[in-house]
Amino acid sequence: MTSVPFAGERRGDAPLTWGQRAIWEAIQRTVPDDHYFNFGRVIRLGARPASVDGARWALARLVERHESLRTLVEDGHQRLLASGELPIVLGDDPDDLLAELAAPAYDYAREWPLRAGLVTSGPDVTHIVMVFCHLAADGLGAEEAVRDLRLLLLRGEPRGSRPPQPLDIARWQRSRDGRRVAAEAAAHWEREHRRIPPTMFYVPSEAGADPPIWRASLRSPAIDLAAQRIAVKHGTSTSNVLLTAVTALVAQMTGHDTVAMLPIVSNRFRADTRGAVSTMAQEGLFVLDVEKVRFDELLALARPAALRAYRSAYHDPADRARVLAEVSEDRGTPVHPYCCFNDMRFADHAVYRDDVLIRRALGETSLTWPMSQDQLNCRFCVHVSGTMDVSVTADTRWLSRPEMERFLRGLEDLLVEAALR
């Protein structure tokens, strides 16, 4: 174990940003399994290894540049500290070190939201491991941090001017312009919540497992190839293809004619959020009336619904909570979809794939069960990774393990059939 001191330019306090508030509420609902939200990056230094002192220096400059990495959260507020010392763990294997650093839940009020580790070979650092508290960064925020760290190691300085910081984002969100954006989003949440079913998975499965939360992961090159072919054919993104397909299957499994999904949206479309090492991603509200039409026709109907969902994602969670409480009271029942979609890929490039290639890829599909735990803040979450692993994390009290597998196999069947039609 070693450490490195850092000294930033300012300190301060502010309410949580909308993105921080959203993930803070999810964390609170997931305790004691909130380590679920920790995530990491392994930076392989390759042909240009660093010295231990050089890696320590770069990590210190990174924490000084990005204030989220020295921000603590306590009692619903963020507290930015100017200086401190970052612990750095030494290890022999990057994957083992990543697992070690990611395993414990964070102490959000006392622990720096970045855990760092170095893998060495003799005097050289071959890998740098970073594990982020989700209050400090989301996936795209972590990529910004990785790019800056590489530039610090290579050139001694990061790129560009000072990036957006959480304190400044929080202050804008409380401004008149920020409240106008929040009000527009709240109107969408209220309008749609007055017409959607109270929740998506509403019939107990009668087959709850112990522990109740499980993840099924389908590695399917066929889904990847089929989604690309459909996206090119219809002039859309593979993410929209997958969101529409998941929605269609939820309708099929639940019997709902109107389906509400909560896609995770990056919220990095604005100049004052782009480039921030912070948690900007939030849930949008995607609502689709699933008609008795073919999948390609449903895809056309989904496009404007997706745009509305993306706009609604940049919202104040306090407004959303108020809207849900008011609508639930008016309707006489709790209203919440508990049905999420998270495309975690950083790029969405589609090529028109040959049908022979798609059919051949069907033989490469495999299913695993990589995770189980006691608590989750949702009933049904679909994740799409960069390796085209499509997973379902679900509460088996509402969707049994056989139903989870049936969903994933059905998703592959639907997309392949639509691609080859």
Language-model features, listed with the residues they occupy:
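Short amphipathic alpha-helices and their capping loops
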Residues: 1-30, 56-93, 112, 164-213, ...
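A short, small/polar-residue-rich loop/turn motif at beta-strand boundaries
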Residues: 3-15, 47-64, 76-113, 295-306, ...
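Gly/Ser/Thr-rich phosphate-binding loops and adjoining beta-strand/alpha-helix segments
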Residues: 3-13, 33-54, 109-129, 206-270, ...
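Active-site-proximal acidic secondary-structure segment that organizes catalysis
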Residues: 91, 114-167, 403-417
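Extended, hydrophobic beta-loop-alpha segments that form or line the acyl/peptidyl-thioester binding
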Residues: 66, 70, 143-147, 257-264, ...
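His-Asp-centered acyl/peptidyl-transfer active-site segments
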Residues: 12, 29-39, 56, 67-68, ...
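Generic recognition of well-ordered alpha-helical segments
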Residues: 57-61, 147, 184-187, 191, ...
